[in-house]
Amino acid sequence: MLLNIANSVGKRTIKFAQSVGSFSLFSFAAVSSIIRPPLYLSLIIRQLLFIGFHSLPVVAMTTFFSGAVLALQSYTGFSRFSAESSIATVVVLSLTRELGPVLAGLMVAGRVGASIAAEIATMRVTEQVDALYTLSTDPIKYLVFPRVIAAIITMPCLVLIGDIIGVMGGYLVGVYKLDFNSTAYLTSTFHYLEPIDVISGLVKAGVFGFIISIISCYSGYYSGKGAKGVGRATTSAVVNSSILILISNYLITELFFKV
């Protein structure tokens, strides 16, 4: 019994170590491909539209209602201590530091990450990736590089727009539902907001963009055979990206806001 448990743990440990090593080599190959021609500018532009522009409605809806709910819930709690004047500050700091980047990252991971993994996994199953080798084309440069660059560029843009829309959601609830004075609410919103709050969120967004793109590409590139392999690659991309987003969010927060 104990021997079987030890054997199972050993196999899982070795498999995990192999996965970490494989992912590290894949990430290094993707990053190092930046300095090698060609640039594939048309592919980058296509991915900028897919990852950025087409994800904007999802991110906008998520952040708008998150800001609105945050204002509503903050009022419910702060009114017990007569601290309603702090609601606007809580909304803007929560969105710019944490909720904006994390929610945008999770939404993009669900929408874009799944799509990237499924697309590359399908190409792997149908041997299109092998065909790139026969055409003397580096698959990582052709498939991974444009998606990684596009995700790193577009995620901060999405987060910045999402922050603005989320603050608008909180403003509309605060002014038109909770009867706050418009000028006082806006003054409170920007009084305690500092550049580091916005910068930390944008740095997180760039890191999240890299995480989503590289994990999704890796999951698709090394997918199993058949429809089951494509499904597992898609699930793995979304789950692993989401987990790493939350972990890296804590680490970056610790880096920027040391207590």
UniProtKB/Swiss-Prot annotation:
N-terminal signal peptide: none
GO CC field: ATP-binding cassette (ABC) transporter complex
Superkingdom, natural source: Bacteria
GO molecular-function term, one example from the UniProt record: phospholipid transporter activity
Membrane topology: Multi-pass membrane protein
Sequence intervals crossing the membrane: 13-35, 49-69, 148-168, 195-215, 237-257
Subcellular location: Cell inner membrane
Predominant subcellular localization, coarse grouping: membrane
Pfam families to which the protein is assigned, alphabetical: MlaE (PF02405)
Record key words, sorted: Cell inner membrane, Cell membrane, Membrane, Transmembrane, Transmembrane helix, Transport
Record family assignment: Belongs to the MlaE permease family.
Function per UniProt: Could be part of an ABC transporter complex.
Protein name: Probable ABC transporter permease protein RF_0080
Organism the protein comes from: Rickettsia felis (strain ATCC VR-1525 / URRWXCal2)
Lineage summary: Bacteria, Pseudomonadati, Pseudomonadota, Alphaproteobacteria, Rickettsiales
